[in-house]
A protein has these predicted regions:
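The conserved acidic donor/metal-binding loop of glycosyltransferases
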Residues: 11-15
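Alpha-helical elements of Rossmann-like donor-binding domains used by nucleotide-donor carbohydrate transfer enzymes
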Residues: 19, 23-27, 105, 109, ...
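Secondary-structure boundary motif
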Residues: 26-34, 89, 112, 157
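Conserved nucleotide-sugar donor-binding catalytic segment
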Residues: 46, 50-136
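C-terminal subregions of glycosyltransferases and related glycan-biosynthesis enzymes
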Residues: 117-176
Length: 176
């Protein structure tokens, strides 16, 4: 079903900037032959021009998601472009009766073996809707305990800072 070398997940009510595809087509070839790179991560922005992402110190920064985003507590939503082969290799778990699974699980799974190229460029525009996943996240997560326990387990790796590991251990017991 996915035919391209890389894929980007776009919510139905969001859109890409006019130069998004051109940007990816221009920048991805710089990293396509780097076996340790899983993809690229760009800014998400709002219609008013503000960012939902935190800028990197450099315009291009390469690191794994656990070290960069989790341990350094880098907040904000980003637009990830990932190798299609990896999206197929690591499918999201499905739990009967559960309708939500955190996307972060996938990025943490990739971070165990791959790095990401982080860019200070907006290519994705979104607005958070009332009643959407971001606004109703906690209630939704509580209705999906098996998936959330699976997600918490991802953070128990020794590469994750101790403070975050303790937090995820406690959350694991909440969902259990």
């Amino acid at each position: 079903y996915i035919k391209g070398e890389v894929v980007l997940i776009l919510d139905s009510d969001d859109y890409l900037t006019d130069d998004a595809i051109e940007t990816v087509e221009k920048e991805w070839p710089l990293y396509r032959n780097c076996a340790d790179i899983c993809g690229m991560s760009y800014f998400r922005g709002k219609k008013d021009g503000s960012h939902l992402s935190v800028a990197n110190a450099q315009d291009v920064y390469i690191d794994d998601d656990i070290h960069y985003r989790v341990n350094q507590k880098i907040k904000g939503d980003r637009c990830e472009v990932v190798r299609t082969v990896l999206l197929k290799k690591y499918p999201f778990p499905v739990y009967q009766g559960e309708r939500f699974f955190p996307e972060g699980w996938f990025w943490n799974t990739l971070a165990m073996n791959y790095k990401t190229v982080y860019r200070n460029k907006t290519i994705y525009i979104c607005e958070y809707l009332e009643g959407g996943l971001t606004k109703s996240g906690r209630a939704l997560r509580m209705k999906c305990p098996l998936g959330m326990m699976d997600d918490c387990r991802m953070y128990l790796d020794n590469r994750v800072c101790i403070r975050r590991r303790v937090k995820e251990m406690l959350l694991y017991w909440v969902y259990a």
